[in-house]
UniProtKB/Swiss-Prot annotation:
Pfam families: Ribosomal_L3
Annotated GO biological process: translation
Gene transcribed to yield this protein: rplC
Disulfide bond residue pairs: none
Keyword Lipoprotein: no
Assigned protein family: Belongs to the universal ribosomal protein uL3 family.
Species this chain originates from: Methylorubrum extorquens (strain CM4 / NCIMB 13688)
Regions of compositional bias (Low complexity) in chain numbering: 234-246
Name this polypeptide is given: Large ribosomal subunit protein uL3
PANTHER family in the record: 50S RIBOSOMAL PROTEIN L3, LARGE RIBOSOMAL SUBUNIT PROTEIN UL3C
Length: 246
Protein backbone atom coordinates (compact mmCIF):
# COMPACT_ATOMS: atom_id res chain seq x y z
CA UNK A 1 0.00 0.00 0.00
CA UNK A 2 1.60 3.22 -1.21
CA UNK A 3 1.39 6.77 0.05
CA UNK A 4 -0.95 9.34 -1.40
CA UNK A 5 -0.35 13.03 -2.07
CA UNK A 6 -2.00 16.35 -1.31
CA UNK A 7 -2.79 18.41 -4.39
CA UNK A 8 -4.61 21.63 -5.16
CA UNK A 9 -7.52 21.62 -7.59
CA UNK A 10 -6.77 23.99 -10.47
CA UNK A 11 -9.92 23.49 -12.55
CA UNK A 12 -11.30 21.48 -15.46
CA UNK A 13 -10.33 21.27 -19.10
CA UNK A 14 -10.25 18.61 -21.79
CA UNK A 15 -7.61 16.62 -23.62
CA UNK A 16 -7.83 14.73 -26.88
CA UNK A 17 -6.95 11.10 -27.52
CA UNK A 18 -5.14 9.84 -30.61
CA UNK A 19 -8.55 8.96 -32.07
CA UNK A 20 -9.69 12.58 -31.74
CA UNK A 21 -12.09 11.95 -28.85
CA UNK A 22 -12.09 14.58 -26.11
CA UNK A 23 -11.82 13.56 -22.47
CA UNK A 24 -12.97 15.96 -19.71
CA UNK A 25 -10.28 16.11 -17.03
CA UNK A 26 -9.64 17.85 -13.73
CA UNK A 27 -6.19 19.38 -13.28
CA UNK A 28 -4.55 18.79 -9.90
CA UNK A 29 -1.28 20.48 -8.97
CA UNK A 30 1.26 19.26 -6.42
CA UNK A 31 3.18 22.06 -4.71
CA UNK A 32 6.26 20.60 -3.02
CA UNK A 33 4.53 17.65 -1.36
CA UNK A 34 7.17 16.47 1.11
CA UNK A 35 7.30 13.73 3.72
CA UNK A 36 7.31 15.38 7.13
CA UNK A 37 7.29 12.39 9.50
CA UNK A 38 6.93 8.63 9.84
CA UNK A 39 4.41 6.76 11.95
CA UNK A 40 5.74 3.38 13.03
CA UNK A 41 4.24 0.36 14.74
CA UNK A 42 6.74 0.50 17.61
CA UNK A 43 6.01 4.12 18.49
CA UNK A 44 2.50 4.85 17.19
CA UNK A 45 0.88 1.45 16.72
CA UNK A 46 0.45 1.81 12.96
CA UNK A 47 2.51 2.58 9.85
CA UNK A 48 1.86 5.80 7.97
CA UNK A 49 3.46 8.80 6.33
CA UNK A 50 2.72 12.40 7.27
CA UNK A 51 3.08 14.61 4.22
CA UNK A 52 2.84 18.37 3.90
CA UNK A 53 2.23 20.70 1.00
CA UNK A 54 2.30 24.45 0.38
CA UNK A 55 4.32 27.12 2.14
CA UNK A 56 3.06 28.48 5.46
CA UNK A 57 4.11 31.75 7.02
CA UNK A 58 6.34 31.18 10.01
CA UNK A 59 4.20 33.47 12.18
CA UNK A 60 1.21 31.18 11.58
CA UNK A 61 3.06 28.05 12.73
CA UNK A 62 3.30 27.11 16.40
CA UNK A 63 6.70 26.68 17.99
CA UNK A 64 6.14 22.96 18.46
CA UNK A 65 5.35 22.55 14.76
CA UNK A 66 8.41 24.59 13.84
CA UNK A 67 10.51 22.14 15.79
CA UNK A 68 9.02 19.16 13.96
CA UNK A 69 9.60 20.79 10.59
CA UNK A 70 13.17 21.60 11.61
CA UNK A 71 13.82 17.96 12.52
CA UNK A 72 12.50 16.88 9.12
CA UNK A 73 14.56 19.65 7.43
CA UNK A 74 11.56 20.93 5.47
CA UNK A 75 9.93 24.34 5.28
CA UNK A 76 6.74 24.92 7.31
CA UNK A 77 3.81 23.45 5.42
CA UNK A 78 0.34 24.88 5.02
CA UNK A 79 -1.52 21.56 4.80
CA UNK A 80 -0.71 18.25 6.49
CA UNK A 81 -2.23 14.79 6.07
CA UNK A 82 -1.44 11.19 6.95
CA UNK A 83 -1.56 8.22 4.59
CA UNK A 84 -1.48 4.62 5.80
CA UNK A 85 1.24 2.66 4.02
CA UNK A 86 2.88 -0.75 4.22
CA UNK A 87 6.29 -1.27 5.77
CA UNK A 88 8.01 -1.51 2.37
CA UNK A 89 6.38 1.71 1.10
CA UNK A 90 7.95 4.16 3.54
CA UNK A 91 9.47 7.15 1.74
CA UNK A 92 12.39 8.94 3.44
CA UNK A 93 11.59 11.99 5.54
CA UNK A 94 12.20 15.18 3.59
CA UNK A 95 11.71 13.55 0.19
CA UNK A 96 9.43 15.37 -2.27
CA UNK A 97 6.79 13.21 -3.95
CA UNK A 98 6.44 14.12 -7.63
CA UNK A 99 3.51 13.94 -10.03
CA UNK A 100 4.82 10.79 -11.75
CA UNK A 101 4.13 8.96 -8.48
CA UNK A 102 0.96 8.05 -10.39
CA UNK A 103 1.06 6.67 -13.93
CA UNK A 104 -1.41 7.21 -16.82
CA UNK A 105 -4.06 4.52 -16.92
CA UNK A 106 -4.20 3.75 -13.21
CA UNK A 107 -7.21 4.54 -11.06
CA UNK A 108 -7.17 6.78 -8.00
CA UNK A 109 -9.51 7.85 -5.21
CA UNK A 110 -9.75 11.58 -4.52
CA UNK A 111 -11.03 13.22 -1.34
CA UNK A 112 -11.98 16.86 -0.95
CA UNK A 113 -14.47 19.26 0.62
CA UNK A 114 -17.61 19.66 -1.47
CA UNK A 115 -18.71 23.07 -2.72
CA UNK A 116 -20.95 24.94 -0.27
CA UNK A 117 -24.52 25.53 -1.51
CA UNK A 118 -25.89 27.38 1.49
CA UNK A 119 -29.43 26.69 2.74
CA UNK A 120 -31.11 24.34 0.26
CA UNK A 121 -34.63 22.98 -0.01
CA UNK A 122 -35.68 19.35 0.04
CA UNK A 123 -35.79 19.00 -3.74
CA UNK A 124 -32.21 20.17 -4.21
CA UNK A 125 -30.79 18.66 -1.04
CA UNK A 126 -32.48 15.24 -1.08
CA UNK A 127 -33.90 14.99 -4.61
CA UNK A 128 -37.52 15.08 -3.40
CA UNK A 129 -40.21 15.16 -6.06
CA UNK A 130 -42.12 18.14 -4.67
CA UNK A 131 -45.89 18.59 -4.79
CA UNK A 132 -48.25 18.80 -7.73
CA UNK A 133 -48.18 21.70 -10.15
CA UNK A 134 -52.01 22.01 -10.13
CA UNK A 135 -55.02 20.34 -8.47
CA UNK A 136 -55.27 22.74 -5.57
CA UNK A 137 -51.57 23.22 -4.80
CA UNK A 138 -50.60 26.86 -4.47
CA UNK A 139 -47.20 28.31 -3.57
CA UNK A 140 -46.04 25.02 -1.99
CA UNK A 141 -44.96 23.28 -5.19
CA UNK A 142 -41.39 22.75 -3.96
CA UNK A 143 -42.19 21.99 -0.32
CA UNK A 144 -41.32 18.63 1.22
CA UNK A 145 -44.84 17.79 2.38
CA UNK A 146 -45.61 16.02 5.65
CA UNK A 147 -42.78 15.52 8.15
CA UNK A 148 -44.39 13.03 10.55
CA UNK A 149 -47.47 11.23 11.81
CA UNK A 150 -50.49 12.33 13.87
CA UNK A 151 -50.92 12.12 17.65
CA UNK A 152 -48.90 8.91 17.48
CA UNK A 153 -45.90 9.37 17.43
CA UNK A 154 -46.70 13.08 17.84
CA UNK A 155 -43.24 14.21 16.81
CA UNK A 156 -40.80 14.41 13.92
CA UNK A 157 -38.11 11.76 14.16
CA UNK A 158 -34.45 12.64 14.23
CA UNK A 159 -32.53 12.50 10.94
CA UNK A 160 -35.67 13.29 8.94
CA UNK A 161 -34.64 14.59 5.54
CA UNK A 162 -35.55 18.26 5.54
CA UNK A 163 -34.25 21.56 4.12
CA UNK A 164 -30.94 22.71 5.55
CA UNK A 165 -27.30 23.43 4.87
CA UNK A 166 -25.91 21.71 1.78
CA UNK A 167 -22.25 21.15 0.93
CA UNK A 168 -18.94 21.77 2.74
CA UNK A 169 -18.64 18.07 3.56
CA UNK A 170 -15.80 15.61 3.15
CA UNK A 171 -16.49 13.73 -0.07
CA UNK A 172 -14.54 10.89 -1.70
CA UNK A 173 -14.88 10.06 -5.39
CA UNK A 174 -13.53 6.63 -6.28
CA UNK A 175 -12.06 5.10 -9.41
CA UNK A 176 -11.01 8.18 -11.38
CA UNK A 177 -8.63 7.37 -14.21
CA UNK A 178 -5.29 9.16 -14.46
CA UNK A 179 -5.07 10.49 -18.02
CA UNK A 180 -1.75 12.29 -17.95
CA UNK A 181 0.97 13.56 -15.61
CA UNK A 182 3.46 16.42 -15.92
CA UNK A 183 6.25 16.03 -13.34
CA UNK A 184 8.00 19.26 -14.35
CA UNK A 185 4.95 21.38 -13.55
CA UNK A 186 3.61 19.03 -10.88
CA UNK A 187 0.31 18.35 -12.67
CA UNK A 188 -1.95 15.31 -12.51
CA UNK A 189 -4.87 15.10 -14.97
CA UNK A 190 -7.68 12.78 -13.87
CA UNK A 191 -10.74 11.95 -15.90
CA UNK A 192 -14.02 13.36 -14.60
CA UNK A 193 -15.00 15.71 -11.82
CA UNK A 194 -13.31 16.13 -8.45
CA UNK A 195 -15.22 17.40 -5.39
CA UNK A 196 -14.52 20.92 -4.19
CA UNK A 197 -13.91 24.38 -5.55
CA UNK A 198 -10.95 25.53 -7.61
CA UNK A 199 -8.06 26.13 -5.25
CA UNK A 200 -9.25 23.56 -2.71
CA UNK A 201 -7.04 20.85 -1.22
CA UNK A 202 -7.48 17.34 -2.61
CA UNK A 203 -6.05 14.07 -1.29
CA UNK A 204 -5.11 11.63 -4.05
CA UNK A 205 -4.35 7.97 -3.34
CA UNK A 206 -4.33 4.65 -5.16
CA UNK A 207 -7.79 3.19 -5.72
CA UNK A 208 -8.82 0.63 -3.12
CA UNK A 209 -11.21 -1.15 -5.51
CA UNK A 210 -8.94 -1.44 -8.56
CA UNK A 211 -5.82 -3.52 -8.97
CA UNK A 212 -2.60 -1.54 -8.92
CA UNK A 213 -0.72 -1.69 -12.25
CA UNK A 214 2.42 -3.79 -12.27
CA UNK A 215 4.62 -0.95 -13.53
CA UNK A 216 3.67 1.54 -10.82
CA UNK A 217 6.76 2.83 -8.96
CA UNK A 218 7.38 1.34 -5.52
CA UNK A 219 7.59 2.68 -2.86
CA UNK A 220 6.85 5.73 -5.00
CA UNK A 221 8.31 8.38 -7.25
CA UNK A 222 10.13 11.08 -5.33
CA UNK A 223 13.24 13.19 -5.24
CA UNK A 224 15.46 13.36 -2.21
CA UNK A 225 15.71 16.58 -0.24
CA UNK A 226 19.26 17.19 -1.48
CA UNK A 227 19.57 20.97 -1.35
CA UNK A 228 22.04 20.85 1.55
CA UNK A 229 23.82 17.80 0.12
CA UNK A 230 24.31 19.48 -3.24
CA UNK A 231 25.99 22.48 -1.66
CA UNK A 232 28.38 20.19 0.23
CA UNK A 233 29.25 18.28 -2.94
CA UNK A 234 30.02 21.50 -4.76
CA UNK A 235 32.17 22.76 -1.88
CA UNK A 236 34.19 19.53 -1.53
CA UNK A 237 36.47 19.92 -4.62
CA UNK A 238 37.43 23.45 -3.53
CA UNK A 239 39.18 22.22 -0.35
CA UNK A 240 42.27 20.67 -2.04
CA UNK A 241 42.72 23.79 -4.16
CA UNK A 242 42.85 26.00 -1.06
CA UNK A 243 45.41 23.66 0.54
CA UNK A 244 47.65 23.82 -2.54
CA UNK A 245 47.48 27.60 -2.54
CA UNK A 246 48.46 27.59 1.10
Amino acid sequence: MRSGVIARKVGMTRVFTDAGEHVPVTVLQIDQCQVVAHRTTEKDGYVALQVGVGKAKVKNVSQAERGRFAVAKVEPKKKLAEFRVSEDALIPVGAEITADHFIPGQFVDVTGTSTGKGFAGGMKRWNFGGLRATHGVSISHRSIGSTGGRQDPGKTFKNKKMPGHLGVERVTTQNLKVVRTDPERGLILVEGAVPGVAGGWIQVRDSVKRKLPADVPLPGKFRENGSAGASQIEAAPEAPASEENA
